[in-house]
Amino acid sequence: KGDSERDIAKKMKIDLISRGADSIPYLPVISGEGGVSQIIYEPSSRVIKNGDILFLDTGSTFDGYFCDFDRNYAIGKASKIVNDVYEVLWIATQNAIEIAKPGLPIYKLWSVMINSLNKYLPNNFSKGRFGHGFGLQLTEPPSITFDNDMKLESNMVLTIEPSVEFKPGKTLVHEENIVIKEKGAELLTSR
């Protein structure tokens, strides 16, 4: 509280470099009261205040490989709807992680996530892709969409990233990184 989005982005860049990142070419730091209006945006001079949700996303590199990772932070106490939406995003993400294994058509990851969102948030405005591959590029195939019948393969690295616009102009996203192994998904991110 008291710092601007830009201040937080600078501090995060310093921290990432001090922990070994080679570069940070992608770092949206976005805030908004009760949620954010968009997730792909440059940090601004907007000062963080109580009641805000702070969305941090990074596409940092190490040894030529990208990570793609986001988190949401409530400044002060989050509202009930924000807590509820975040919990549903967590459930949707977990449901996708649990079914991810070699041979699974990618659209099934999308389906399990959209079904989770629709079950608990029937009036949501979710659409688009809910994750993608990454590695040598920040965004690589496959895209986790409703119509992608490509099958998961061992050693694919994916971001599982459901998002929901839970009311007009208010969005939350939850993201986890996984690698596909013979027996299922291995979580790469810390929870």
Region locations from a protein language model:
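Active-site neighborhoods and metal-handling regions in enzymes and metal-associated proteins
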Residues: 1-191
